[in-house]
Amino acid sequence: MEAKLIQDLIENNKPFRIETAAGRIFEVPHRDFISFSGRKTSLVVNYNENGDEHFAIVPLLTITSAMART
């Protein structure tokens, strides 16, 4: 996945979701829940699971789908 496509979703400041090749799905409710690594080769995604806060480092090469939610 190209960094520009993800950057556009972040700049729209609307919820979106990311799916990885491993089948993981990350819901991004707001731009504060996601950021790029320094070289824009990976994403850092913050998420809640069972009431606990977590983060995942997701290489852009493993992202198979990114789409805005309506």
Predicted regions and their residues:
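Motif-centric detector for short Cys/His coordination patterns
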Residues: M1-T70
